[in-house]
Amino acid sequence: MIAVTTESTADILPLQLGYSGIHLLPVPLGHQGQVYSERELPPDQLVNLIRTTGEPARTLAIDDEVVARTFEAALQGSKSGRLVHVASGSRFTPHFEVAARVAGQFGVRVQVIDGGTVSYALGVQALHAAHLADQGADFGQIARALAELRERTLLTFAVESLDFLRVNGRIGNVAAFIGNWLGLRPLLAVEAGEVVSKARVRGQAAAVRTLLSATHQFQHQTGETLRLYCGHTIGGEGAAEQLQGQLQAVYRDLPAPLHPLGSGLTANVGPGVVAVLAFPRRFGLGHA
């Protein structure tokens, strides 16, 4: 069976890691010259640190030696002696480039796939890869399946405050002030390996309605039964529960579980984020 690795910022739950056997590359977080692990800087502490200092936190490149050790450990537990690494989108982070460089040390035993996305959308790809590997799929079959999954995944999220986008240099001070004053929430989506702006809405209720509408449109486009997740960063639990209730009122036979999103995404978009993740149910995730 082919082993599977991905990044710690893929927001895979401990239970899922246990049954899937996925190995994680630990993504470091940097703030004012200090380097932290995600365990050392969980979302609540991360948010407080950024708010207190007014300085951004960023995900840093993973050290080559750490990548090599993780690959070696995963290979040792693989019956086939082969490994697939699912990396976060190469347009978002340097992790794909680092993993691909290190993979060269292992020859044909390691294949690195550009996941083209982040957070739990990346985690879903890794879980599906592990599910396929458990069924005996080879490199080519896994790569083709993940390419199709990427094309048929919806990841759209509403940002609560513009302050973190300002701190990270994505918008200016004036734009952040006006946007917060008006109660505007940007709606962002990951499409074709990039983050794109979809809309700006006023208030939580409008944000949830827009996410619900995006799900309806996606379901109509795919014409398939979906897997649904209501993601949230810290502080976004209430909005996620509201979204969950509205999704379940429409898609009565489909669960839409809440899924916490960790420090990697929080560092970039802040607390209070609510997201919808959807993809066809035929893409199995093992025991999920």
Swiss-Prot record:
Q: Which Pfam families match?
A: DegV
The record's listing under PROSITE patterns reads: DEGV
All residue ranges annotated as the DegV domain in the record: 2-280
List, in alphabetical order, the Gene Ontology terms for molecular function in this entry: lipid binding
- Cytoplasm keyword on record: no
Q: Which InterPro entries match?
A: DegV (IPR003797), DegV_C (IPR043168), DegV_domain_contain (IPR050270)
Q: What does this protein do?
A: May bind long-chain fatty acids, such as palmitate, and may play a role in lipid transport or fatty acid metabolism.
| The protein's name | DegV domain-containing protein DR_1903
List the source organism: Deinococcus radiodurans (strain ATCC 13939 / DSM 20539 / JCM 16871 / CCUG 27074 / LMG 4051 / NBRC 15346 / NCIMB 9279 / VKM B-1422 / R1)
